[in-house]
């Protein structure tokens, strides 16, 4: 029997969509027991934090970006999958555009030991074309249609209301 959605423990999280004018996107590589996933920088809200406070904290911790220019809330994503620590049944992500006038070398405030403890193993700028061409079974992006959604942001600009990205 499936649990009703209201009984699920859903972690609130936030992610940054950093896109340069030449269409590079900053991604983080997470290593999970079953696969590697490239995602956008960010993470869960701490107790009492707003989404924007959490985004700013996560950008300092993971990327070393202080005083980011945060723009529009562009996407939402909810996925129901138990977290490895057993505390959560799923996660609800809010994605915000963050100004990136050029590529920079990420300098996380957290040590690589601390980041690896959170399963984060690499930060890398990907060109949009690279994301589109990464079709092998071992390269997973989160959200799955990341290239499509980024291309829509570049072509059409931010949506009037946040778009559901699917898984």
Could you say what each language-model-derived stretch is?
Residues 24-65:
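Conserved Nudix-box catalytic region and its N-terminal flanking loop in Nudix hydrolases
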Residues 19-24, 33-34, 46-47, 76-81, ...:
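Short, charged/polar surface micro-motifs in flexible loops or helix N-caps
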Residues 79-110, 124:
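Active-site-adjacent beta-strand/loop module that shapes the phosphate/pyrophosphate-binding cleft
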Residues 11, 33, 40, 89-93, ...:
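Short connector loops at helix/strand junctions that flank enzyme active sites
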Residues 4-8, 86-87, 115:
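Short Gly/Pro-enriched turn/cap motifs at secondary-structure boundaries
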Residues 35-38, 104-167:
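Nudix hydrolase/Nudix homology domain
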Residues 66-76:
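A short coil-to-beta-strand element that immediately follows conserved catalytic motifs
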Residues 2-25, 44-47, 95:
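Conserved N-terminal beta-strand and adjoining loop/helix that marks the start
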